[in-house]
Amino acid sequence: MADERKDEGKAPHWTSASLTEAAAHPHSPEMKDQGGAGEGLSRNANGFPYREEEEGAFGEHRSQGTYSDTKENGINGELTSADRETAEEVSARIVQVVTAEAVAVLKGEQEKEAQHKDQPAALPLAAEETANLPPSPPPSPASEQTATVEEDLLTASKMEFPEQEKFPSSFAEPLDKGEMEFKMPSKPGEDFEHAALVPDTSKTPQDKKDLQGMEGEKLPPVPFAQTFGTNLEDRKQSTEPSIVMPSIGLSAEPPAPKEPKDWFIEMPTESKKDEWGLAAPISPGPLTPMREKDVLEDIPRWEGKQFDSPMPSPFHGGSFTLPLDTMKNERVSEGPRPFAPVFFQSDDKVSLQDPSALATSKESSKDEEPLKDKADKVADVSISEVTTLLGNVHSPVVEGYVGENISGEVKVTTDQEKKETSAPSVQEPTLTETEPQTKLDEKSTVSIEEAVAKKEESFKLRDDKTGVIQTSTEQSFSKEDQKGQEHTIDELKQDSFPISLEQAVTDAAMTSKTLGKVTSEPEAVSERREIQGLFEEKTADKNKLEGAGSATIAEVEMPFYEDKSGMSKYFETSALKEDMTRSTELGSDYYELSDSRGSAQESLDTISPKNQHDEKELQAKASQPSPPAQEAGYSTLAQSYTPDHPSELPEEPSSPQERMFTIDPKVYGEKRDLHSKNKDDLTLSRSLGLGGRSAIEQRSMSINLPMSCLDSIALGFNFGRGHDLSPLASDILTNTSGSMDEGDDYLPPTTPAVEKMPCFPIESKEEEDKAEQAKVTGGQTIQVETSSESPFPAKEYYKNGTVMAPDLPEMLDLAGTRSRLASVSADAEVARRKSVPSEAMLAESSTSLPPVADESPVTVKPDSQLEDMGYCVFNKYTVPLPSPVQDSENLSGESGSFYEGTDDKVRRDLATDLSLIEVKLAAAGRVKDEFTAEKEASPPTSADKSRLSREFDHDRKANDKLDTVLEKSEEHIDSKEHAKESEEMGGKVELFGLGITYDQASTKELITTKDTSPEKTEKGLSSVPEVAEVEPTTKADQGLDFAATKAEPSQLDIKVSDFGQMASGMNVDAGKAIELKFEVAQELTLSSEAPQEADSFMGVESGHIKEGGKVNETEVKEKVTKPDLVHQEAVDKEESYESSGEHESLTMESLKPDEGKKETSPETSLIQDEVALKLSVEIPCPPPVSEADLSTDEKGEVQMEFIQLPKEESTETPDIPAIPSDVTQPQPEAIVSEPAEVPSEEEEIEAGGEYDKLLFRSDTLQISDLLVSESREEFVETCPGELKGVVESVVTIEDDFITVVQTTTDEGESGSHSVRFAAPAQPEEERRPRPHDEELEIEMAAEAQAEPKDGSPDAPATPEKEEVAFSEYKTETYDDYKDETTIDDSIMDADSLWVDTQDDDRSILTEQLETIPKEERAEKDARRPSLEKHRKEKPFKTGRGRISTPERKVAKKEPSTVSRDEVRRKKAVYKKAELAKKSEVQAHSPSRKLILKPAIKYTRPTHLSCVKRKTTAASGDLAQAPGAFKQAKDKVTDGISKSPEKRSSLPRPSSILPPRRGVSGDREENSFSLNSSISSARRTTRSEPIRRAGKSGTSTPTTPGSTAITPGTPPSYSSRTPGTPGTPSYPRTPGTPKSGILVPSEKKVAIIRTPPKSPATPKQLRLINQPLPDLKNVKSKIGSTDNIKYQPKGGQVQIVTKKIDLSHVTSKCGSLKNIRHRPGGGRVKIESVKLDFKEKAQAKVGSLDNAHHVPGGGNVKIDSQKLNFREHAKARVDHGAEIITQSPSRSSVASPRRLSNVSSSGSINLLESPQLATLAEDVTAALAKQGL
């Protein structure tokens, strides 16, 4: 059960752990904030307490970290809270006890310890534990404590040793395995950290299931090897306390953990001395694994948490690696093993070596739980033993050093993680499996910082280790204990120790049970409260820690051990002070830690609580003030943390790595000291693959995950982002962050932390990260302060559901855009603060992120790795990688500095990041959508979505205002060169994207696209990659939340395990999370979704949401105000899904049901349209009806997304396989990926109105339009439900040549262009847009973009927008190629409204496809009316696309005031125009879409005009775009009422889609015509399907006119094209919202209301002035053009499929003769011939005579007789004859030299020879005779 638990819990937890580990550093701060002791350390890292804790915690912090980890592990997670409650009491009491006992123990018991250490005589390895103990020489109470701890540890070890002996039976195998494996990893001890990093992901899945606790601890360190090892060690300690806690339930087991400690100490003492990691694993491994498993088995709930504790204990012992490895090998081999090999290796090393030392401390701590009295002793003994252990470890400096490093750093991380684990524990109970991982990661985070401190202290110890090891260790322990451990241990003691010892046992068991129960029920709600309360407690705890400072030094030591159990018990390490009383209470309070994140994270955190926790922990650790759970409390923590280490902070920020250590400034400072002091630690770290101590410290401190993150990046996702959970997002973030974020507060790994830790902490962390980025630019000290502010920005980060978004962009921008981020930092922070409520959403999103990250560890990690390696990892967002060029152009004005400065890095990072973004956005979006669909579609969907719809209606109105505000704000931000928009949008967008992704895939994606895109464009897709990174986790979390996670087992193993873990954890959380999430998710999802989006989009609203105290209020407020945004986020997510492909349809379907519930919500209907559109794209429209199907698809897509994520690094091929439904899906994914950026680009353009933006927009949007057009065509074809003219485009990609077979079918109502990418295209999905046919892709993108942009308001529009975003990315990829062909696309992009219109068309198409679910359409009708109401209020006479555009614009307007004004101006025009009808159709979606689109639309014209040769047309478009925007808005508002009419007409644009494609070529020349046409067509199509879905039966007055508008899709090109009024017949004047929008300024003539003659006539689509480039003239590399009979009209593409008959192939070796294999299979005849060696073979020596061995075996009798071969050898050589003579029977037969019984090797074949009995004697006699 323990293993299962571990697997289940660990998978999510591990997934979280990956991200968490990546986010472990963010978690560390948060853990510090959250966990009393661990939090204290974190605080100390962030603030003075942390520093004190750090110093004290360097040696102590390991144990303390263990406690913190344990507490956070949820095993003793509550203990942390409870301990934290009585932190002061515990501090005083423990200080007394520990001081007295430490002195006594140091004096008397130190000798005991020395004796005991004789047991662990090799405990020079205790140096590792010394790492746990503050290895620093400060000889102070800590010194005494060290002796005491050692003594106690030895006592505990001895005590535990017998128990270990008890456990050996169960631990025996793990021990052997663990020892072997531990030795194995230990030997690669240098790689141990690396292994911890690399295997983290692998381990994570297995550990989640198998070693939730074990792995959790181990895995958490994996994020950064040391963190992982430390985490494992700390978790071990935690686990041991956990076991002790189970010991409460498993009284005997704590001794066993202690025993493992003894084993650890003794065996490590023996073996570990030389091979600490090697020998140590021997005894500890089994013990710890056994203990962990047994304890976990004993404690079901605590299992994962306990696994966290026990697992690290084996790690601590070093043998833990084996159990971890064994378990991980078992588990990791199962699913994560793919990642496991990398992560596991590093993790093993880190965990293996570190755990031995940490295990000793932690096991000592564990024992302390049951043995409170002894705990003091054990604490000292543990420390001393650890010191000894470290000393032993020092013997094998590399391994021992690694152990020390890992132990110290991991322990720091563990401490922080424990602290953080308090929060994750809160969620972990919900996700016992998932959460334990979070806890583990949190522990890991805590441990990492502790480990860093302890590592440095360990290093110091190592320096002093020989003679001074104990003294030095003790001194270090004392000094550092006094310094940092005062706080750390104070916290730990306050948090865990008192409760650990006294309550820990009771609370451990109780907490285990309580946590299990609370985990089940209160977890969701409680998590939120706990997160908030925990942060408050953390803040108070931090103060207490600071106040307890000195007293805590001695006390800390005790809590260090007691806390080990206590921390495991009570997650809130920090809470121990304040919430000593809370220890019991923390069962729920503990959940409170995860609660804010829990509500949001309950959805996602259930999936990857650890991720979120880790992310939050990362942020918490990096920015303690950041915990959004309690904005004020966490900020206070951050502030206190900042004050604590203001100098340290600047110190830390001095280098990104140092800034990483900002989390543990003290630890970092100590580490830096040790950095300088112990170069071998650096060497060890480097050996471990951590890149050296400073790198380790940087990574671990940056996020306490950056190591993990960087490692995962090196490994190349998410999740994940860290080493375990966040290798992907966190890792990318960490990698970027580690490189770019130069502060601890700046924790790109915070993204995992966001998802892992409570949303708030993560957000604040994210804010901190952002602030830190900005402050890295601005000031180091400010960064921490920014961290204080950060909680709100972090929430916005979480809003994106991907804290990673800002972090990643910031990371990406680190080199180039840091200044931009610095300028943006304030805005981003403001936005983040404003979006405190969105933090909950972000938490959910973050939660989803971890799974991705978990899966990402391989997927994202590879991406990160690849991008780190300089490989352009083409993920879904692969195309955006080229975007950096465009981004460079656009970013030149917006964030050009970033892209230009870090273009290569951005490209490389963006390649990964984009893939991550793509995957994460898609996954997060899918997960979010799944989550929303399943959860919100469930009661939450009904209630939440309905409420959201209502709120969305309100928000629609509010958004009109807020959009104005937000668009003004965005305009303001854009005015700030999008630097702040990039930062704010990056913060907002990232928060937004995260929250949105979590909220709804499309919303997240849309918002991410929208908000992040500006950042993307500015940051060169930095934001997008971040969003992707974070969002995949969100997706994963959501996917995990959903059975959907399990829906696609084909995902990566990690994906499966993540999803399995997450699903199990999330499903476990599903009941309560669905309920609580119904409450919280309704609240948080609504508040998070809306608030996050509102936060991102509504600077004003964000301001309100800004306050942590206002989180709920703001959430509600934003729920009301932000539903539009939330749904836009959903649209973004759905676009992200579109980008994801499968998830799009799933999201659409999921959203559809949601929309059904949100009938009144215009956003909902838009989402529904989007869902329909996505469905059309992803699911050709069969699944659109079934929400269950969607759920499954979503799940599949989520997993597929994860698969994509893992595969993403390779290419979009994973996505393509992930999108088997339709080849189109991959393109939508690709397209969606671009729209994610394009919308934001539009936003940037509109908001910024900058030429660069326009340029970038034009390029990107051109491509985006092409991609979107293509995608749109795909959509049309995919969902022929309402296809008037179905243009089926089968795109086959061969060697960059895209063969597009366009089959025009006039079967659908509206021209539906279905682009089906043949399987060949899938691998080149991303490239396809480039090669596809820039024209076709551009045209398609134009269609898709025009439609998505037009229909962007509609859900399909949003997907379209996401398609556009992806298209944009693709455009970037093949931007240059598309530049010419993209001129039209650019114009289309410029006609954001056009694109929106076509988005609406797409929505229409989707809706048409959704026509299958007529009910949904009816719902959409209902929704649309509500949307129309709101849209009417906000008249968007944008036509089908315009409606969405205006609304989107409204949201986007924040950046662009001109757009708003012009939109208003054009409102009247477009109100008149029947475009309003189309807008009406898009009305519901527009809020979201418009929010994103308006700026984009407005900007897009400018952008296009700038970039396009048709500057006149573009400028006309641009000039008109603002007016058109306003008109579109007006029309959208008007269109709301006219939505029915428009909807009917909207489907027509689908038919235009093929023409759009055909017009692609013309688009360059007549860009506007094409753009208008395509956009109109697309919008028309979208709006029409939307309208149809929304008002299936109602044909509004504009049936012809509306049709004209909608049909205008083909003429939409002409409408769009100023010079193409000739397409009027086809373009519907109203249906040319893009055209209309453009028309107001430049092509009002293009506003031809002539209904498209044949919506299904692709030929008319080609009537557009610019048909797609003549592909006939294109020469493909592979000659595929020969097969493409493609006419601009479309439908004439002939894709010839040649079947390859391999039957005629002849094998080189002729083996085919024997293989009766036919292609059909089944005819393979494998002949198995048994060999009779006796008959056929002749022995060289003649031994075969005696070998009666048949291959089958059975008759072989091997008699083993030991012969004196010394004599025999000589005899054989010299006296063989005599020997033969001596062998009676044998000698006669065998030649003198060839004894039949004696083989040539001298071994006697004692098979069946008669003389075998006497042979030995004979030989001996013969030899003896011969004088041998």
Swiss-Prot record:
Principal localisation: cytoplasm
Compositionally biased tracts (Polar residues): 596-610, 778-790, 1613-1623
Residue stretches of biased makeup (Basic residues): 1431-1440
Xref: Pfam families: MAP2_projctn, Tubulin-binding
InterPro entries referenced in this protein's UniProt entry, alphabetically: MAP2/MAP4/Tau, MAP2_projctn, MAP_tubulin-bd_rpt
Biased composition (Low complexity): 120-133, 1546-1557, 1567-1578, 1591-1607, 1783-1796
Positions of modified residues (Phosphotyrosine): Y746
GO MF: calmodulin binding; cytoskeletal regulatory protein binding; microtubule binding
Stretches with biased composition (Basic and acidic residues): 1-11, 109-119, 174-194, 205-218, 256-276, 290-306, 363-379, 412-421, 451-466, 477-490, 667-683, 944-986, 1103-1161, 1324-1333, 1359-1373, 1412-1430, 1445-1464, 1471-1481, 1527-1544
Region entry Disordered, spans: 1-86, 109-379, 397-490, 573-684, 765-794, 823-863, 930-986, 1005-1044, 1087-1165, 1206-1228, 1304-1373, 1405-1640, 1778-1802
One BP term from GO: microtubule bundle formation
Name by which UniProt lists this protein: Microtubule-associated protein 2
Organism whose genome encodes this protein: Mus musculus
Lineage of origin: Eukaryota, Metazoa, Chordata, Craniata, Vertebrata
Gene: Map2
